[in-house]
Structure formats: structure tokens, C-alpha cells
Amino acid sequence: MVVLMDMNTNEYDIRLSRGHVLIDGGEGLLLVDTGSPMSFHELGRIRLCGGEYSVPESLPGAGADYVSGKVGERVAGLVGMDILGPLGARIDIPGGKLILQPSTEGTAPVPSGVSGLGYVFADMTVAGRPARVILDTGAPVSYISPSFTEGLVPVDHVTDFNPMVPGDTFETPVFEIPSSFAGRDFQMRAGHLPGFFTGMLSMLGVDGVVGMEIFGRMPVVLADGEVRA
């Protein structure tokens, strides 16, 4: 349920912590996570852009204490696509701003869509091949199907976390892969998700999960069920 309030702020300063996108929601820091279909807050509500949204106090395996420990800042909640999708959002990490209910002026649509589960899909090119990925601001490390890295030599190894993984952490090699999104070419650094995650993505017709490798390079607008850049 949404209760209208006398709050008209739709622009928020972004701060990064360990590659995670945080904003001050007025009742504690919020992790901005387009890869999460659901939001939560330890107070059971999130107040943004003139509205109050009733949300659970935690998600399975992930509450405020868990997220705080992973991102390195005291976080009160997470704002996901159940709020960001209907509002629309311009996520401008290079400019340091999150704008809700944004204008789409000066942007062009990217082949994309939002699934019934709340995930944001977009098309890009990886290693000269078309790839459909989930756009996830909650992913400091990006991931791509191993089929896109065949023959490549890792340039790094990293440890990442996910509450669905036994022990909640996993290691992955990282590769540099020629990629393109919204007409912009770049070298994407991406690893491999644990096998069962790759299988789940394959069932959704998805080749990977991309976060800061795109969001850190350009403003991205989510509006009216599409992605624009």
C-alpha cells in the first residue's frame, strides 16, 4: 500500500561502498538494488519520492544486519524493483545521483524488458555475440555464462557473496571481454556464477548479470517497463 506524504524529493545523492549503490532514505541508508524484485526496511516502511511504501522488515536470508556487514556501511534497508519499477529511476553513478520519476529526454530505448518476477533484462553484445543480461545495481562484480569466456585467460580472481550460496561466499575467475551496450564499446570484467545460478539464468533465457560494468560507465534510465541510456 502507498500512503501519500508531504515529501517531494525525487533526487538523491549516491554514495558507493564496496561497489554498492547507497542513498539516504531519511530513515537510514538504503541499498539500491535493481537485481532484487523486493524491498525491505527494518522499520517495515520506505519513504521515497512523496510516498510511504509498506515493505517487509527483512528478506529470506538477508536483513539489515546481513547487508550492512557485506556493504561496509550501516544499512537500514534495500529498495528493489517493486518500488523502483513503478516509480521509474535514472541511475547516474558517474554523476552521483538517483532521480526517481525521471524524464527520458535525451535517452534512447535499449532492447529490454521487465519480467513478471521483477527482473530487468537488457540486450548487449559480449565477445561479438548477442547476450541478454539482468541489469543489477546490486552487483559490484558482473557475471556472464562460461560459453562467452571460452579460450580466455583470467585476469583476476575475486570472492563475492550471495545468501543463497552455502556459506554465503564463493570465488570466481574474472575475465576481460570486449562488450557493447547502448552503442558504447568497452572491456567488461566478468566472472562466472556458481553452476546452479547459471542453470537458473539459462532457464530464464539469460546469459549473465551485469552491474557496475554498465552502471558505472553511463546513466541508465528505467521507465515505463523499458531501459533507456
Question: Can you describe what each PLM-predicted range is?
Answer:
Residues 1-229:
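Pepsin/retropepsin-fold aspartyl endopeptidases
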